[in-house]
Amino acid sequence: ELAPLDSMIFAEMLEEAGCPAGVFNLVNGDGIGVGSQLTSHPDVDMVSFTGSTRAGALISHNAADDFKRVGLELGGKGANIIFADADEKAVKRGVRHCFNNTGQSCNAPTRMLVERSVYDQAVAIAKETAISTNTDIASKSGKHLGPVVSQLQFDKIQVLIQAGIDENATLVA
């Protein structure tokens, strides 16, 4: 809805590869306007959706009347778990994975659970990795962390960070 270019490129790739018309259909738009219309339309036989649990529940509800097939991938953010015998690069890889796609990926880990005996070492590695990550505009090539998609998303992230701090999480950088 806010960043449809990658989906449009994927659709073009499928067409160029010879995918038959109608096998894959891309409809861009917001969930309330386009999503509700699409998921409740009688000519739509199946809906595949990746996104929030709230939106997935609405899709399931809309699709139930017609017994549509529904595939949902919802709220998949999880934790990195670091045990004492973990590879010494595990923390660094975990932090970098968290930053993939500016952290706006459904499989980006949102926290790190660390065994007590290696906690201080893990915090130091996580902090150094985060601090050494370059930031720049999204259109610039190279390895760096770009901006989030909107001010609304930025504000949501700030609320989530504060919620973690309020629940005694440690913000390391």
Model-predicted regions and their roles:
Residues 1-22, 45:
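Conserved small-residue-rich beta-alpha loop and adjacent elements
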Residues 2-3, 26, 114:
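Glycine-/small-residue-rich active-site loops that bind phosphorylated ligands and cofactors
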Residues 3, 30-37, 51-58:
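Beta-loop-alpha module in the N-terminal Rossmann-like domain of NAD(P)-dependent dehydrogenases
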Residues 10, 25-48:
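A structured beta-alpha segment of the ubiquitous adenosine-cofactor-binding alpha/beta core
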Residues 23-25, 170:
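Conserved beta-strand segments of alpha/beta enzyme cores
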